[in-house]
Amino acid sequence: MTDSEHAGHDREDGELEDGEIDDAGFEEIQEKEAKENEKQKSEKAYRKSRKKHKKEREKKKSKRRKREKHKHNSPSSDDSSDYSLDSDVEHTESSHKKRTGFYRDYDIPFTQRGHISGSYITSKKGQHNKKFKSKEYDEYSTYSDDNFGNYSDDNFGNYGQETEEDFANQLKQYRQAKETSNIALGSSFSKESGKKQRMKGVQQGIEQRVKSFNVGRGRGLPKKIKRKERGGRTNKGPNVFSVSDDFQEYNKPGKKWKVMTQEFINQHTVEHKGKQICKYFLEGRCIKGDQCKFDHDAELEKRKEICKFYLQGYCTKGENCIYMHNEFPCKFYHSGAKCYQGDNCKFSHDDLTKETKKLLDKVLNTDEELINEDERELEELRKRGITPLPKPPPGVGLLPTPPEHFPFSDPEDDFQTDFSDDFRKIPSLFEIVVKPTVDLAHKIGRKPPAFYTSASPPGPQFQGSSPHPQHIYSSGSSPGPGPNMSQGHSSPVMHPGSPGHHPCAGPPGLPVPQSPPLPPGPPEIVGPQNQAGVLVQPDTSLTPPSMGGAYHSPGFPGHVMKVPRENHCSPGSSYQQSPGEMQLNTNYESLQNPAEFYDNYYAQHSIHNFQPPNNSGDGMWHGEFAQQQPPVVQDSPNHGSGSDGSSTRTGHGPLPVPGLLPAVQRALFVRLTQRYQEDEEQTSTQPHRAPSKEEDDTVNWYSSSEEEEGSSVKSILKTLQKQTETLRNQQQPSTELSTPTDPRLAKEKSKGNQVVDPRLRTIPRQDIRKPSESAPLDLRLAWDPRKLRGNGSGHIGSSVGGAKFDLHHANAGTNVKHKRGDDDDEDTERELREKAFLIPLDASPGIMLQDPRSQLRQFSHIKMDITLTKPNFAKHIVWAPEDLLPVPLPKPDPVSSINLPLPPLIADQRLNRLWNTKSDLHQNTVSIDPKLAAKAKINTTNREGYLEQFGDSHGSGAKLGDPRLQKNFDPRLHRLPNTESHQVVMKDSHASKGAPHLPRSNPGSSQPSGAGTSNSGSGALPPYAPKLSSSAGLPLGTSTSVLSGISLYDPRDHGSSSTSELATASSGENSKNQKKSGGLKSSDKTEPSPGEAILPQKPSPNVGVTLEGPADPQADVPRSSGKVQVPAVHSLPVQALTGLIRPQYSDPRQARQPGQGSPTPDNDPGRETDDKSLKEVFKTFDPTASPFC
């Protein structure tokens, strides 16, 4: 039996191995055998000390089950079986040899089990150990049912019954059965294993209940113990339950009660009336309720506060709420007022007790305190000189519109100064909102000199320099906000503040008190500015205008304003020098004022830049600006101190801008201020230095307003002012230099209004600076700088500032300033340009616009959809087609041909229309372009081998074209003829249109043209060449190139019908191309209908050509080619080529060979038929039909 068993066992092992991918099956068998052997080995020991082992096992198993209780459902817990299997494997050999008899009894069932597990393992290697256990258990149950019938063990039967009774009993019986199995030898062991299996089967219900606890056997236990008994494993579930029950018992709250320590009790309870009451209950937040471990036997005292939920209508806690509900006294009833709720009142009308009286008094006092607090705040505001706003109605915002708070004149000054202290934030908000309002008022034509000066006077005042203040306001205000530049250029449209500026210009003595005029000055500025006598107020208004326009645009008025500020000691002294100069300056300001006002939006940036040059101290200009627009002034004063005409305007524009674009403007403002400070340092004038003290004042005042708008800008302005004051003192003459720069910048910024702004600026500049010299210089500089500085938006501000500098220099000496201005202009222009690149206005330079316009002019005379820039490129690209040819070749023929024919039809129609309507222009322009195109085309066609069609001129080119065509032909036989026609088409289109069309035409022609395309193109081109040249007035080479492209397409149709004809007709490379591509495309398009379909897709003239044959296509091709050349549309030539080339496919053979010598005879009939063919084509052919159909 031993041998046979071994043999059987070997077979079984082999079978297992055969069914398994891994050795798992065999290992499992060995492991199980080893397990059984181990059990047998330990039987004696177990007999001697069964109870001892049982206890130890039970303890270990219980621990293991406790550990794996949480792993019941995870199959991974089955890994423990791996360990058990491994442990069994260790004893496999010894057990196998020793227990051969045992294997007889156990071998078959185990083999079955092994096979099953083996098959399972085969399907899933990684999990075979894990899931093998579960399957193994099932197999055990099966085995016990099938094979264990003979072993009806009393213990087992009793065990199965007991299992159902109780988990604890089941565990005990299982252990007993396990012990008995250990005692029994051979059959007894197999019986026990069967019992175990059957026990598992009996316990499957339990396992399900436990969710297969057996799956998660303790991995931690020794392998032998784990693996010793399957039943033991199965019983783990019950064990787990029992253990879990015990564990739950330990975890029961009852247990916790017992565990509570005095410390724990003291932590969670409070002694209340001699009892330890749950402190959470007393606080009204014990969530355990009746289950709480601590006593809740206490009456909760209500907190002496009204329940806010009860007050709002409903409290979910009801009587349990710790806050007062209806016990709270009714304040209406007890205060003597009538309680409309009466008996239904939710609050108590009972007599007041000491407690309730305290509560009532507290409530009433709270209301009084609120009222008193408001009154105290209002009193504080009044003390500070701030008129408190009326209490807004409920639902209205806290901040009313600024006008409600105060007028922008005197009240604004006080208000702003107060804001600078404690109310800076609110004022800044008001000013931000109000400034645009003021600008709008100026635009509307209102007085708002005061408002404007305070809010947005900078632009308007200066704008008004030349026109009356009212005119300045109306025109300036409207232009100031957005189109400062353009309006600045137009004198009438200066900033609304310009009237103030005007007065400043008018009054030689600018108002010295720039800072005082700031709030009140603006209103006065309108009147006093008009009056030379009121220097201070005009200065104030000027300062806002200077910020807006006077300071910016009238470099001199700006300086005058600034100078008065700078020279506040001698208000008007700087400007008093010459009222005429003042007027000129004001005019200049007015001219630049629109730019100023426009810049006001960009102003704060440019203002800083221009302020130093215009004002010796930015603070001066800031003071002026602040006067004009205290809130905005902060930003705009920077412009003011920068107060180059344009920059100031830029700054002024930003005055409203701070509200609109504070972040961006501030960023630009900082940039411009820094840049312009450098410029100002170079161009700062001495007079600017004079008002440095006032600048400080203005800076302080401005700082207050600036604080309202933003502390960062304020600090920057202060720093810039200090720096610029020194620079201005040092570089007062340099401001003259900056004047040309500023005008340029102003013009650049007024680019949108280039026509208006330059003119206006020119006029004021002329007035300010020796109307002829300085003005033309300024204008030229302004124009040039625009173009030069057009890159930067800040440059406009600088140009405006330059104008102001010019005005100021006119006072100080325009000649000197102009000299320095030129040098400074270059430096400043460079700086401005670099800075301007950062500004979004960089793209607006006049030069840039002019170039596109000139290009547009080219387009206009061409009147084609072709971009004129391409013709320039086309010239270069004409030679590029060689390189481009490979590009179109890679394109898919069907796609490119389909796409190209449709556009070419449109293009051909356009070309025909354009050719007819503008034949003269096209002949001239196209003759120029076509000549170039013809030359290029001849070269390209020669390269492509189309010269054969054209004749001698093309003959030389054909040689060049032949190798190219051949090269292209060799690698891409199908596309080479197309490339030839494409090259021709591209040449035509390049001559007229440019390189970009070449690839289009090439793919289009290559796809539709086919092998016959190149041949027919060369053949048909000679006849078409004279027609194209004569009709289009283009050189024969050009028209022939187009014709060659067309002939290429015509051969396509013919090529589809007969490729051999194409090959014969084609000469030189054309014949080769026809043969190669003809074979390819003829095979692709063996049917003539595809060629026809292609033709209809192409323009009508092309279709006509295809229908009528070489003559028609030739005639059409010359026309279309001429047209194509005129518009320089590559798509048109391609279309013509695609459509015409195909019809000429067969003809081109004939045409090319004889056509080269005599193309004209073909052209005559072709022309006649072309017209018909065009009409017919449009009628008969479907433009959407695929050329490959």
From Swiss-Prot:
Segments of this protein annotated with the region Disordered: 1-105, 451-530, 630-659, 676-755, 947-1026, 1051-1189
Q: Where is composition skewed (Pro residues) in this entry? A: 505-525
Q: Where is the composition biased (Low complexity)?
A: 461-478, 639-659, 1009-1020, 1056-1069
Basic residues compositional bias: what residue ranges? Answer: 47-73
Coiled-coil region(s) at which residues?
Answer: 27-73, 353-385
Phosphoserine modifications at: S1158
- Which residue stretches does the UniProt record annotate as biased composition, category Polar residues? 718-741
Q: Which UniProt keywords apply?
A: Coiled coil, Metal-binding, Phosphoprotein, Repeat, Zinc, Zinc-finger
Q: Which Pfam families match?
A: zf-CCCH, zf-CCCH_9, zf_CCCH_4
GO molecular function list:
RNA binding; zinc ion binding
Q: What is an annotated GO biological process for this record, any one?
A: negative regulation of DNA-templated transcription
GO cellular-component terms in the record?
chromatin; nucleus
Q: Which SUPFAM superfamilies does UniProt cross-reference here?
A: CCCH zinc finger
Q: Where is the composition biased (Basic and acidic residues)?
A: 1-12, 29-46, 961-973, 1164-1179
Which portions of the chain have biased composition (kind: Acidic residues)? 13-28
ZnF C3H1-type residues are 273-299, 301-328, 329-352
**PANTHER family, per the entry:** ZINC FINGER CCCH DOMAIN-CONTAINING PROTEI, ZINC FINGER CCCH DOMAIN-CONTAINING PROTEIN 6
Identification of the protein by name: Zinc finger CCCH domain-containing protein 6
In its UniProt entry, the species of origin is given as Homo sapiens
